[in-house]
Amino acid sequence: MKRIAIAILCMLPFAAAAQNQHLISPDDSIPSLVERIIAEREGGYKIRKIKSNINLEFYTTANAYFTDGKLDDLSFKMNRVRLEIAGRLNDHLSYHFRQSFNKYTNPHSMDNLSSSIEYANITWHASDRFNLVAGKQFVALGGYEAYVNAMRLMEFCDFNNNVAVYQAGLMGVIQFNPSQQLLVQVVNNRSGSDSDLYIYGRPDGLEAAKVPLLATLNWNGLFLDDALHFRYSASVGQLAKGKNIYYLTCGNIYEKYPFIAYLDVMYSREGIDSQQRITALQGHGKGMLPVTAQNTSYLSFIGNFDYHFHPKWNAYVKGAYETSGIYEANGIFAKGRYITSWNAQACLEWFPFTEEKGLKVFAHYLYKGYELTENAEVMMASMPHTQRISLGLVYVIPVL
């Protein structure tokens, strides 16, 4: 026993040295990222012509909240603060990192990343026709609202607001031609454990998924001199043994200055209620033991019209109509519709400096209405109509 202990003690310094080994040594002569961007020359420095940028993104508002027309609260809010680093190291490798400072920083059990890390990936550009993306990335759902940068949106629909769209995995990008693209993606369907995903845990009697992945096929097409854009996708994944999730999502976009118009259709069929919108209705009745709903379906229609009527001014109106239901009875949940919801938005945006596209000041109005069916009322659920008036500022600062 003494000999074993002495042998282990003798090995400890070598183990420590191994842990302290540098993956890249100064003697390797590998240029750093800064050196790839900035080159030294006589009389000073010059910026190399490689694609790289660092952005700081701020989105803040003063909000007045109303319930059924009565003022609830007037306060300031930092909606989003993000740091984004993206660029291309050479002809074959690019990178994308983005961190939000408005989300939890504790690592999740599955991907070992916090939800504050939205992007952390490397792209291998194998050829002009094929790229491979590895790491945390955006789930390749169809639709314009799901795809566009969140800094350009004042409010998501309930569907997109309840889908975890940043997951770790792999994606192949096939570029048939400049206007036709196919994405083939496999990612985790969640970041953490079942207890993190479902507020009342995985339903009793269901075994955990052995392959908790989501596979997506996404087609993007451009037509009419790139003014007409289609984003269609289909996804399938496993939530538990015998319980799957399916997404069918599509976006139909017309974008030609000074107009942007789109119509998105989003549908999910979930063996277990991953969006939790029906599950969250319960818990208000006496003697009810809350459980996670099964066999849920969600459908959303989102329409938007932007009019950039002046170089410094843009206005848009937007609406969404959404339904939530159970497609097969289970436990306390009867088959049928539970929620019909809609929202209406109007926004006026001012760009103080035409050369500074990343800065805008805006006024925004949001109305959200809900109608509960008898299925939901049985659970003593209530969802009042709400309104919000916001004055805000969005500033994307190009640091590099």
Q: Where are the predicted features?
A:
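Exposed loop/turn and edge beta-strand positions of beta-sandwich/beta-sheet ligand-binding modules
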Residues: 79, 116, 128, 166, ...
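Short, electropositive alpha-helical surface patch
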Residues: 112-115, 191-198, 334, 338-341
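Loop-centered beta-sheet repeat module
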Residues: 185, 189-247
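N-terminal periplasmic/intermembrane-space "pro-region" immediately following the signal or transit peptide
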Residues: 18-59, 392-395
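Short aromatic-enriched loop/helix-cap "lid" or pocket-rim segments at secondary-structure transitions
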Residues: 145-147, 196-197, 275
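Outer membrane beta-barrel
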Residues: 45-64, 70-192, 221-224, 370
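Bacterial Sec-dependent N-terminal signal peptides
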Residues: 1-22
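Outer-membrane beta-barrel pore domains
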Residues: 21-28, 61-71, 109-110, 224-400
